[in-house]
Amino acid sequence: MRPSKRAADEMRTISFERGVSKHAEGSCLVKFGDTHVLCTASLEEKVPGWMRNTGKGWVTAEYGMLPRSTGERMRREAAAGKQGGRTQEIQRLIGRSLRAVVDMQALGEMQITVDCDVIQADGGTRTAAITGGWVALHECLRWMEARQMVRVEKVLKDHVAAISCGIYEGVPVLDLDYAEDSVAETDSNFVMTGKGGIVEIQGTAEGVPFSEEEFGALMKLARSGIDRLVSLQKMAVA
């Protein structure tokens, strides 16, 4: 039995709230159960130096956790003077995931930065950030379209979403919360597009290796979860 009493293939309650930031061109507060992430998409009408005069745009991401997003206060990374390795890994993952569904040529020489700030963490912060980050990006592009800068459907080629799966007490389960994630025998994250394309898979065994059959079960769970997330994204931006 899962600590949350959920079925093996049952996700937490997922919600997207758009337009939560007064200043950002696009924003979304995404909730995966008790994991809450504020995603904002900010437009700059310029690109990094290495992309100038290419006619292409760029999408990048930053990620951070508020000090009391966890059970005990975390020291701000800014106070430490540098980002931790985990933070850098996650924000690169978010950026890669979003770029996988963006036509940079159609975006033109502009950059969109998606900031993902974890307000409350209960497992799956990176998957929530990717999924909510797509909604914030969509809202930014919609803002641009209203000003005749781009066409959303030309720039954003597909949905992208992410979900965690793992093996908890010998059973493959979908969308792990912290109580499961912290003791799972296997923990994995799947990033996929709305059309079913695989963007990234991260999978780790904790002590006991997992089999190809178990991986197949996790993949099946992930696909069902991504399908549901994409449906929720569609409703959120409709």
UniProtKB/Swiss-Prot annotation:
GO biological process: rRNA catabolic process; rRNA processing; tRNA processing
A Pfam family reported for this protein in Swiss-Prot or TrEMBL: RNase_PH_C
Keywords from the named record: Nucleotidyltransferase, RNA-binding, rRNA processing, Transferase, tRNA processing, tRNA-binding
Cleaved signal peptide residues: none
MF-aspect GO terms: 3'-5'-RNA exonuclease activity; tRNA binding; tRNA nucleotidyltransferase activity
PROSITE patterns: RIBONUCLEASE_PH
Entry binding sites for phosphate: R86, G124, T125, R126
Reaction(s) this enzyme catalyzes, per UniProt: tRNA(n+1) + phosphate = tRNA(n) + a ribonucleoside 5'-diphosphate
SUPFAM superfamilies linked to this entry: Ribonuclease PH domain 2-like (SSF55666), Ribosomal protein S5 domain 2-like (SSF54211)
Family: Belongs to the RNase PH family.
Function according to Swiss-Prot or TrEMBL: Phosphorolytic 3'-5' exoribonuclease that plays an important role in tRNA 3'-end maturation. Removes nucleotide residues following the 3'-CCA terminus of tRNAs; can also add nucleotides to the ends of RNA molecules by using nucleoside diphosphates as substrates, but this may not be physiologically important. Probably plays a role in initiation of 16S rRNA degradation (leading to ribosome degradation) during starvation.
Subunit structure: Homohexameric ring arranged as a trimer of dimers.
NCBIfam families on file: RNasePH (TIGR01966)
HAMAP family to which the protein is assigned, alphabetical: RNase_PH (MF_00564)
Protein name as catalogued: Ribonuclease PH
Species for this entry: Brucella melitensis biotype 2 (strain ATCC 23457)
Gene this protein is translated from: rph
